[in-house]
UniProtKB/Swiss-Prot annotation:
It comes from Rickettsia akari (strain Hartford). This is Small ribosomal subunit protein uS12. It holds the Pfam family Ribosom_S12_S23. Signal peptide: none annotated. Keywords: Methylation, Ribonucleoprotein, Ribosomal protein, RNA-binding, rRNA-binding, tRNA-binding.
Amino acid sequence: MPTYNQLVRFGRKSKTRKSKSPALESNPFKSGVCLVVKTVTPKKPNSALRKIATVRLSNKRTVNAYIPGEKHSVKEHDRVLVRGGQVPDLPGVKYHIVLGAYDISGVKGRKQGRSRYGAPCKQIAVTKK
């Protein structure tokens, strides 16, 4: 507990919050180039082959980013858009690739949750009477 005089002289220091996605440098998105596309297995209770890509961002940092959805078109040297967001069962994967941006197509045949997977809207023909 500080004394009154210590508070007058030094004040209270506010804690600085640590960023969960430091490579984005306070930006919502960063563009980058895909270096490697690979599959990894998740932590203990889960079992799958999760698709991730190693991406070199525009600020020269290299990160591992998760590729969401069922099928993907991510290849080496593709230009991708990266957003923050951890994958709970993949250690070291703190970023997601945005589908439907730059060289990456969205998930085809998606009817619900389309914006998350970059799926286009099926236009409904309206006839005038």
